[in-house]
Design a protein with these regions (language model features):
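Glycine-rich, acidic and aromatic/proline-enriched surface loops and short helix-turn segments
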Residues: 62, 147-155, 201, 205-209
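Active-site-proximal loop and beta-strand segments within enzyme catalytic domains
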Residues: 70-184, 191-193, 197, 225-233
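Solvent-exposed coil/turn segments that connect beta secondary-structure elements
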Residues: 59-61, 71-73, 150-151, 219, ...
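Catalytic loop of the DD-peptidase/beta-lactamase superfamily, centered on the K-T-G motif
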Residues: 21-67, 171, 188, 193, ...
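Extracellular/periplasmic catalytic domains that process cell-envelope and extracellular macromolecules
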Residues: 48, 78-79, 109, 133-140, ...
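Proline-centered turn/helix-capping motifs that create local helix->coil transitions or kinks
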Residues: 153-157, 211-222
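Bacterial Sec-dependent N-terminal signal peptides
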Residues: 1-26
Length: 387
């Protein structure tokens, strides 16, 4: 990997004022950007989405970058393309990328038991000490954590006050914030360097992501979004003073597009590392990813080979393998999907609890995506699916 290649995505996006007058959808249909803008505004208005930022990439170039609605509804402050938005679980693909960059540097190994990188026994760290009672903890590797198969729960608080494994490592998919946060802790502990500093060095600064951080920076105060519930009530701002591997990223859709372009163009990691990230590691066999249905056994997604790689989910479509990730937190809902064979991607970020209700429409109207398995992570079902 050569450093000067890292400038490619940035150079492309610096020209984002030259937006296309038409958007080409996955199936080849063309939609005028003026028409798309009107359609998206209608979806935002009727869906009561407080604020929405949309970036569409075709052939590794930004062809659409626009915002709708408000960053702060109570103050009637409009969202703009430089408004930073709390990105929640969008952090996870970035955490996975950052870790693989450190693997490329020879600092970490993907399949070495993670406890080897701790400077002290696990029971000496108050937040993680209960893992000492888990006989399978010594078997957990970074690969398992990044593919959500470590056996750690999504959040310990669903199971009590302490952290314990809920499955045998490598045997079952359980989406886990705890796992990603633990991996972030290990990186900081072993390297004696903060995650945000690593991200600045390896991702943000090389790609010119000036509106991004894994922690809250003072400059974000000038133009930031506030989270809102389904009724439009303010839920405040997510100010994270410390980085979390599972979800502390603050960014814009334009900045995140720079990251995705560089990642899928093999400009951030070695080809071997990217292949490992995108390769299906564990099949999704549950009807839902969250809530009581996460323990169900279902063949609902067998036909599309829905699976998780390292920090990124994948599924089959008529246009080849596609990749995706989302964010769901009170007041914040976001989603991105990438179609590498079509060189197409869309990033949607909102400060509203109402985004997911309109997600099917938004994906279909932006790039003609009617294939993403959104129902796995939300109770909103697709009314009609075009095949």
């Amino acid at each position: 990997m050569k450093k000067h290649f890292l400038c490619v995505a940035t150079a492309l996006l610096l020209c984002n004022f030259l937006f296309a007058q038409e958007i080409t959808e996955l199936n080849g249909n063309k939609v005028k950007t003026t028409s798309l803008t009107e359609t998206l505004q209608h979806i935002v208005d009727t869906g009561r989405i407080t604020g929405l930022s949309v970036s569409i990439i075709e052939n590794n170039q930004m062809v659409f970058n626009n915002t709708f609605g408000f960053k702060n509804l109570a103050n009637q402050e409009k969202m703009d393309t430089n408004t930073v938005i709390y990105a929640g679980s969008f952090t996870k693909p970035m955490m996975a990328t950052l870790f693989m960059q450190l693997v490329d540097k020879g600092i970490f190994e993907l399949d070495k038991p993670i406890f080897h990188y701790l400077k002290n026994p696990i029971d000496s760290y108050p937040k993680w000490q209960t893992l000492a009672y888990e006989k399978d903890f010594p078997n957990i590797t970074a690969r398992m954590i990044l593919s959500h198969s470590s056996g750690m729960p999504i959040m310990r608080y669903f199971y009590g006050d302490s952290l314990y494994l809920i499955a045998k490592p490598s045997e079952k998919f359980y989406y886990s914030n705890e796992g990603f946060n633990f991996l972030g802790f290990v990186v900081e502990e072993y390297t004696a360097k903060k995650l945000d500093d690593w991200a600045k060095e390896l991702i943000f600064e090389p790609l010119g992501m000036k509106n991004s951080g894994l922690v809250w920076h003072p400059e974000f105060k000038a133009n930031h979004a506030t989270g809102h519930d389904a009724e439009g009530k303010s839920l405040g701002v997510q100010v994270k003073p410390t980085a979390k591997g599972a979800g502390s990223l603050v960014t814009t859709t334009a900045d995140y597009a720079k990251f995705l372009i560089a990642l899928f163009q093999k400009q951030l990691t070695s080809e071997t590392s990217l292949d490992a990230m995108l390769k299906p590691h564990i099949k999704i066999t549950s009807k839902r990813g969250f809530g009581p249905l996460r323990d169900t056994i279902s063949h609902q997604f067998d036909a599309i080979n829905f699976a998780w790689g390292l920090g990124i989910a994948s599924f089959d479509t008529p246009f080849g393998k596609a990749y995706k990730h989302g964010c769901h937190l009170d007041g914040w809902q976001s989603y991105w999907t990438v179609y590498p064979q079509k060189k197409m991607m869309v990033i949607l970020m909102s400060n509203s609890d109402n985004l997911e209700k309109s997600m099917y429409d938004l994906l279909e109207k932006t790039i003609g995506d009617v294939y993403a398995p959104l129902e796995w992570s939300t109770d909103i079902q697709r009314v009609e699916k075009k095949l």
